[in-house]
Amino acid sequence: MKKTSSSKGRESPSLLIDARIEELGDWRGETLSRVRRLIKQAAPKVVEEWKWRGVPVWYHDGMICTGETYQSVVKLTFFKGAQLKDPKRLFNSGLEGNARRAIDLHEGDQLDETAFKALIREAVALNGSSAR
């Protein structure tokens, strides 16, 4: 499910994310594309948004995570990360916070795809239980 903008002349968030991936044109774009694919596999009904002047955000009954791109890192920030189990210890940033946790991916890093999809599914379940 893709969320589209109702404003005339604005591109859908999904198209903006596509353009960002293409614009990056390097390992960051490849990483963001791979992460996006994994998120969609884990949560097929995910909604994509484009926030804060260029940050992809994935929603399902609330925010799941962002996909921020910087010069040397792709940062995946989970809004309720502190409440998620992370048995494979994917979270490696923002560990001191009360709510958020992040996964920083640098060039050449390997992401445990199975563990990542489990985190996405758990975040979706947590959002669903909070929405009731």
Residues of each region from the PLM?
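Charge-dense, helix-prone N-terminal extensions
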Residues: M1-R132
